[in-house]
Design a protein with these regions (language model features):
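Terminal accessory carbohydrate-recognition/targeting modules of carbohydrate-active enzymes
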Residues: 2, 22-239, 284-285, 294-300, ...
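Bacterial N-terminal signal peptides
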Residues: 8-17
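C-terminal capping/lid segments that line or modulate ligand- or cofactor-binding pockets
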Residues: 25-72, 278, 333-356, 360, ...
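Aromatic-rich carbohydrate-recognition surfaces in CAZymes
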Residues: 214, 278-402, 432, 611-627
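Well-ordered alpha-helical scaffold segments within catalytic/enzyme domains
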Residues: 228-236, 249-250, 287-300, 348, ...
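Long, well-ordered core segments of solenoidal/helical folds
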Residues: 247-260, 298-321, 329-330, 369, ...
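Acidic/His metal-coordination segments adjacent to aromatic residues that form catalytic metal sites
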Residues: 268-275, 331-351, 405-427, 476, ...
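Extended ligand-binding clefts on enzyme/binding-domain cores
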Residues: 314-342, 351, 426-437, 448-449, ...
Length: 631
């Protein structure tokens, strides 16, 4: 996930006692049009992004780079003297409240305002005269008044977009260079063009309806509660309930609501993690987020995510690497504008991840099974009606990228779930698994569409893949992660979801796999993805593959529960729930197992991508729903 960080490491302190405890995670608010980040340890808001992702589009000067970065307007926004505050989400929502001795501040991005808007308000403590103080991320180039009293339009060097400041209370004279000191409450609204300033003021005025800042926060909270779906799971304690609610919030924050237009087709995409890390939509992580939305009952958001897969464009960039087959679903991830991004690993190669195609068919089939929405299959998308797009640009290229093995088929060599480097591509059991699952779902979809030839083709391919899987990946009574032998994937955390999907049913093989998972157990108490084979500490994966990976923990806990080992499963789950409760109900990508400069902190501290989305809240929600189904 966070391979995109710079891969040059400082010296690593391996001993537990040499690493200080990690600071509490930063809090993120968002409304589908942008993000803002609050850092409790400094009592400061540190970022305000004008888009709900980190990278807008490809960089034509560096096609294998991260892309054009989304504007961030602020480096630091605080009040009074710099100092730590106690911050948390209000009632498990996206509203952040920070308290210090000299006052209380509230930050949120409202869902009712269809713009990248951040509302901030400050209530000074008695006999305190706290005022907002801002450090802009880029030098201020110009500012001008816009119509109403106190409204200002700011332009910055190096940022094409503008920032509109609308006071929500009385305005006073502010020190030079500190416009936010003029009022205790503001709306900060990012604008793509300065000419949009007056329409934005009108939109804001309608949304505000004359309410003061405190009432705006109350109304936002009430509207958010109305949006929530009634939980379909029983909670065993309050911590589980709060983590469910906060996870539901994170899933909503992570989804783009930006409308599609001629130069942007990202509406509905869901990022894999929220800032401060790289907030980018990965096909795979988004599938787990979408599945959580489906099963929770958030049909509108799930439908938007599915449409996003089929409207993203341009795609099919890697046709030469996939036997010339044109395809719709990105082989790795997307830029914010919906352009396919074939993930660059900084080793000079793109990635091919065929499991993505099966995962999209999986979530599409599950959505249609739950909601019976025939109109979705007829919806106009980038490559025609959605059903035909799924058939011709997911199923056909998927089958075209299978290979004969024994009496069956397996998916061609790729980089799969753990994003291996393309020069190290292998035949992964997980990619063949997702092809089996996805084609099984598509057979049902084709039946709904009355397309018998496509249904039969999917079923035939599914059956051949089942045969190929058994021959290729079950050897000597053991389940292996790859066709190619090797210590790294012989026991692999990805084997657990394979079993949970029902691809492997032999109790002896399942039991052996669970027993061998002890080879992946780490000092923090959970499990890593694989046994890393890198020997150079300067390589990112040398450290990354030593840390505890929560997605594997969730999957193993579910398998243990199915095997009747309820006590072990509950202990694994409650450990994650308890650690999240101590950190604003945020679920990280990983826990520190081997402390180092890249993943600092004490053993067991949250690390990696924080807050995670699909592999965090999505995985947690699905785990509780699976537990409910097994009651």
């Amino acid at each position: 996930m966070i391979r995109t960080v710079v891969r040059i490491l400082a010296a690593c302190a391996l001993a537990f006692g040499l690493c200080a405890a990690a600071e509490a995670s930063h809090l993120v608010t968002g409304n589908g049009f942008g993000f803002a980040v609050v850092a409790p340890e400094s009592g400061t808001a540190t970022k305000f992004y004008s888009h709900p992702y980190n990278y807008l589009r490809p960089d034509p000067k560096n096609p294998l780079g991260e892309g054009i970065e989304a504007p961030n307007f602020i480096k630091g926004l605080r009040w009074g003297a710099r100092g730590a505050g106690k911050a948390d989400y209000v009632e498990d929502s996206h509203i952040i409240r920070m308290r210090r001795g000299d006052g209380t501040a509230t930050f949120f991005m409202p869902f009712g305002l269809v713009r990248p808007a951040l509302i901030i308000s400050l209530e000074a403590a008695p006999r305190k005269a706290a005022r907002w103080r801002v450090e802009w991320n880029r030098p201020l180039r110009s500012q001008r008044a816009v119509g109403a009293t106190g409204v200002r339009l700011l332009r910055f060097d190096g940022i094409d977009e503008s920032l509109l400041l609308i006071p929500l209370g009385p305005v006073q004279i502010a020190p030079a260079g500190q416009p936010l000191a003029a009022s205790s409450a503001w709306a900060l609204i990012a604008l793509e063009t300065a000419k949009d300033a007056e329409p934005a003021v009108r939109d804001f005025t309608r949304w505000r309806s004359g309410l003061p800042a405190r009432e705006l926060a109350k109304r936002e909270l009430a509207e958010f509660e109305q949006w929530r779906a009634k939980p379909a799971a029983h909670f065993r304690n309050d911590q589980e309930r709060h983590l469910w609610r906060q996870s539901e919030t994170m899933l909503r924050i992570a989804q783009s609501r930006e409308p599609n237009r001629a130069d942007r087709h990202g509406n509905g995409l869901i990022v894999a993690a929220l800032p401060d890390v790289y907030s980018t939509p990965w096909v795979r992580d988004m599938a787990w987020s979408t599945m959580a939305l489906i099963r929770m009952g958030h049909q509108a958001e799930a439908r938007a995510a599915l449409l996003a897969y089929f409207n993203a464009q341009p795609t099919g960039k890697m046709r030469a690497e996939v036997h010339g087959a044109d395809y719709q679903i990105s082989l790795v991830r997307y830029w914010g504008d919906g352009t396919e991004e074939p993930f660059f690993t900084q080793e000079g190669a793109t990635n091919i991840e065929f499991d993505n195609w099966g995962e999209v068919l999986w979530v599409l089939g599950q959505y249609l099974s739950k909601y019976d929405d025939p109109a979705l299959l007829k919806a106009a998308t980038y490559r025609g009606r959605l059903y035909e797009s799924a058939r011709d640009f997911i199923v056909k290229p998927l089958i075209a990228n299978t290979e004969k093995y024994g009496d069956g088929l397996i998916v061609a060599a790729d980089t799969s779930i753990w994003e291996e480097h393309q020069p190290d591509k292998k035949h992964f059991a997980f990619s063949t698994t997702m092809a089996i699952v996805g084609l099984g779902e598509f057979a049902e979809i084709a039946g709904r569409a009355g397309d018998e030839p496509a249904r039969r083709q999917a079923l035939d391919a599914e059956a051949l893949l089942q045969k190929g899987f058994a021959a290729a990946f079950i050897r000597d009574g053991k389940l292996h992660g790859t066709l190619e032998p090797g210590v790294k994937n012989d026991i692999d955390g990805a084997l657990i979801p394979i079993i949970n999907f029902g691809i492997v049913r032999d109790p002896k093989i399942i039991g052996d796999t669970v027993d061998r998972m002890e080879l992946l157990k780490v000092a923090s108490g959970g499990y890593r993805r694989v046994r890393g084979t890198y020997t150079d500490p300067k390589i990112f994966e040398y450290w990354y593959e030593q840390e505890e990976f929560l997605f594997v923990d969730f999957q193993l806990a579910e398998l243990l529960r199915r095997l009747g080992r309820e006590g072990e499963a509950d202990a694994m789950l409650q450990r994650i729930v308890g650690k999240s409760a101590a950190d604003h109900n945020i679920i990280p990508e990983m826990y520190v197992a081997v402390p180092c400069a890249l993943f600092p902190g004490r053993i067991g501290d949250p690390t990696g991508a924080i807050p995670m989305v699909g592999y965090g809240p999505g995985a947690y929600v699905l785990h509780l729903l699976d537990r409910e189904d097994g009651r």
